[in-house]
Amino acid sequence: MKKAFYISMVLLTLSFTASAQEWITNLDEAKQIASKNNQNIVLVFQGSDWCVPCIKLDKEIWSTSEFQKLSKDHFVMLQADFPKRKQNKLPEELQEHNNKLAQQYNPNGYFPFVVVLNESGKVLGHLGYEKTTPTLFYKKLVAIEN
């Protein structure tokens, strides 16, 4: 009985891990991938442990297999997280990088704030949180490109 429980827990953990959004956390790396693959960048400013709309956006859009299937060959996903809890503190270098991204792309400090960039980092448009489906949110991101 214990063995079956442990096996089911491992499988459950793997299923959550397999469906996680693949995030890049460095703008230069995102630009390089975007340029190589002829893709645009979706830059997401979020407060992963304090911003309720950010958490909803992650749960309802980014973490869904539906959105991931639609976006994986179309966008490079770049995350700039600003957690507040001590246990979620980012490494200093990453925090400095995120602060620079915020100065450049989110000077008003909106959370969540989704910015679509071209492969060289030019802003094409932006979105915030809205209650919608992963497919409709994806279509809004694509519409920004056009």
What do these predicted regions represent?
Residues Q104, N108-N146:
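Non-catalytic, surface beta->alpha helical segment in thiol-disulfide oxidoreductase systems
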Residues W23-I24, F67-E96:
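Thiol-based oxidoreductase modules, predominantly thioredoxin-like and allied folds used
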Residues S48-C51, I61, F82-K86, G109, ...:
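Solvent-exposed loop/turn segments at secondary-structure junctions
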Residues N37-C51:
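Short active-site neighborhood of thiol/selenol oxidoreductases, capturing the structured segment around
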Residues C54-L70:
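Typically the conserved alpha-helix immediately C-terminal to a functionally engaged Cys/Sec
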Residues V42-L43, M77, V114:
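Hydrophobic beta-strand anchors of alpha/beta hydrolase catalytic cores
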Residues I24-I41, S71:
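A short beta-strand-turn-helix
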Residues M1-E22:
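Bacterial Sec-dependent N-terminal signal peptides
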